[in-house]
Amino acid sequence: MKNILIAGVAKSGKSLFCKKLAKKTNYNHIPIDYFTASMKRNFPNWGIKSSVIINDTSKKLSTLLNTVTNLIDDTDEKFIIDSAHIMPSDIIDNINRDNWNIYFFGYPNISAKDKLCEIRKYIKDGWPTKKDDNELITILEKLINISKEMNTQCKKYNIKFIDTSFDLNKKIDELIKKIL
């Protein structure tokens, strides 16, 4: 089994996938977003941003991930790394695909209003609960557009894109079965 990089937009099922897969396997889970937030707070001069919207941080984190994945490649342990701050075009040359499977999660085919309803129904903590509906709709519209761009880039770089616009749990369970 290869190591796994899970990337994609916020609230696309990345963490849920990682938790489910780690529970069924011996993969160690590394959520990069905690490190991103720490770098933002502790080293502001690095220019790392941990906003929900992917920005120039993707290039910087891809360089960091290159070093991390190279170190992991020298171990016998298996890892799942997940991040909401990476674009396919930035990671493609920074990871050894012989040792890593890469999956991007997004929701390019759902309306912001429908995604908002899903979030309000299922998400009971975290940053979405601190946003009012109008704020969240604005963010979701941007994330839907980023999902579309990720999907396009994934096709270009032959990276698997998991569309979680609908049937999120089913899509996650299908991917886990495929990996196992």
Where are these regions (language model features)?
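Hydrophobic anchor at the beta1->P-loop junction of P-loop NTPases
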Residues: I6
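The conserved Walker
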Residues: A10
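Conserved glycine(s) of the Walker
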Residues: G13
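Conserved Walker
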Residues: L16
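Conserved substrate/cofactor phosphate-moiety recognition/catalytic segment
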Residues: K19, K23-T63
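Glycine-rich phosphate-binding loop used to anchor ATP phosphates in small-molecule kinases
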Residues: D56-N109
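A glycine- and Lys/Arg-enriched "phosphate-lid" helix/loop adjacent to the NTP-binding pocket
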Residues: N101-I146
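NTP-dependent small-molecule kinase module
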Residues: K148-L180
